[in-house]
A protein has these predicted regions:
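Active-site anion-handling motifs in enzyme catalytic cores
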Residues: 1-130
Length: 130
């Protein structure tokens, strides 16, 4: 999958942090990553929020919906797709090569989400005041 063996073996699985302030350890661990990939919703949400390139692995609809809603549907792969492993391998390599570009795309997506939230808040506030 990886032509460079250093890349192949420089992979870590996030530990299970527990207890008070464990979220700090969790986010510190994530911030050291070049790429996050997983099927868990929070793995993907946190990666996007931290501007860490993600590859979502769809095993249930909620994850695909996240990527569709924010316009990043190409960053989520369906594990049941016939050529999943080839596509996943290609996406891993491409993501590592395009890290900076993907981070910039995430920043734009988050800015748009904030603008959308602000517009909805104004509409809600107007509706409630009637």
């Amino acid at each position: 999958v990886f032509p460079d063996l250093n890349i192949k073996y420089n992979i870590e699985i996030a530990p299970y942090f527990t207890g008070q302030d464990s979220e700090k350890e969790f986010f510190n661990f994530y911030e050291k990553c070049d790429l996050l990939t997983g099927m868990r919703f929070h793995t993907n949400v946190c990666g996007i929020a931290l501007n860490i390139p993600t590859i979502g692995i769809k095993t249930y609809q909620k994850l695909e919906d996240l990527y569709l809603e924010i316009g990043l549907e190409e960053r989520c792969l369906d594990v049941n797709q016939e050529n999943f492993f080839e596509q996943y391998s290609k996406e891993l390599q491409d993501t590592l090569l395009r890290k900076k570009e993907i981070k910039e795309e995430y920043i734009k997506v988050k800015k748009k989400l904030i603008q959308d939230k602000d517009k909805k808040y104004i509409l809600l506030k107007e509706w409630l005041s009637k």
